């Protein structure tokens, strides 16, 4: 399986994490780690999410970008890492 890290900027809304996790799960990714820091100056959340899957990370990136409360999604490590079982 491939391991990826996403950096996400989102609006600080009550349902944003639920939507983020739901889309991630629907697309066949497993969340292996997540950190979130609120930015009170501009009402945004800075989220770093690690995921693993055999699916294309680009597809997940585009799906998350479509969410209303998501401002930006970038893949932190373009080259995937192989995770041993």
Model-derived segments and spans:
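A conserved regulatory-domain signal marking ACT and ACT-like small-molecule sensing domains
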Residues: 2-85
């Amino acid at each position: 399986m491939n391991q990826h890290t996403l950096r996400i900027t989102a609006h600080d809304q009550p349902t944003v994490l639920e939507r983020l996790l739901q889309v991630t799960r629907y697309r066949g990714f497993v969340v292996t780690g997540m950190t979130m820091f609120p930015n009170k100056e501009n009402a945004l959340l800075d989220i770093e999410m690690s995921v693993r899957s055999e699916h294309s990370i680009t597809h997940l990136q585009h799906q998350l970008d479509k969410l209303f409360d998501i401002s930006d999604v970038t893949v932190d490590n373009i080259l995937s890492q192989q995770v041993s079982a």
